[in-house]
């Protein structure tokens, strides 16, 4: 009788683990490519030339736009050369060819800084060129509905 109970318990554990991990995690992960994300649009300042160390010590301030997500997301890469992450909360927005918010492409959206927005665009690896691990090149940026 005890052997049956242990066998039943092990069967349940195997069944639960097979259905809840890693399949459910993978199903909730974003893939590189076109995505739709919602969060708050914020600005962050980083030091630029000449030393790339401190704005307060004279380095040029470089302002970037960040989409702070409502909740952390998982990002998985199709190849090992693309970074993966769990619970990523910040994605850098890049409009046009300039990642810094001084470019003319940013002007039509300045009124959205500090607001909740919805962004549809191409999710890309940030790499060394950008301040954040992931960037989104938006096709559409619009004000999001307020959360219930």
Regions found by a protein language model. Give the residues of each.
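Short nucleic-acid-contacting surface segments enriched for D/E, G, S/T with interspersed K/R
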Residues: 101-119
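OB-fold/S1-family single-stranded nucleic acid-binding modules
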Residues: 69, 126-148
């Amino acid at each position: 009788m005890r052997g049956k109970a242990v066998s039943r318990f092990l069967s349940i554990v195997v069944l639960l683990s097979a259905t809840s991990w890693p399949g459910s995690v993978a199903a909730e992960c974003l893939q590189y490519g076109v995505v739709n994300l919602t969060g708050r649009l914020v600005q962050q300042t980083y030091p630029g030339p000449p030393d790339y160390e401190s704005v307060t010590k004279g380095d040029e301030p470089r302002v970037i736009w960040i989409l702070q997500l409502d909740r952390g997301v998982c990002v998985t890469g199709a190849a090992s050369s693309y970074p993966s992450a769990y619970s990523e909360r910040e994605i850098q927005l890049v409009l046009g060819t300039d990642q810094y918010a001084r470019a003319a492409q940013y002007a039509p959206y300045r009124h959205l800084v500090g607001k909740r927005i919805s962004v549809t665009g191409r999710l890309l690896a940030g790499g060394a060129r950008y301040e954040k691990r992931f960037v989104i090149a938006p096709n559409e940026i619009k004000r999001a509905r307020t959360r219930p």
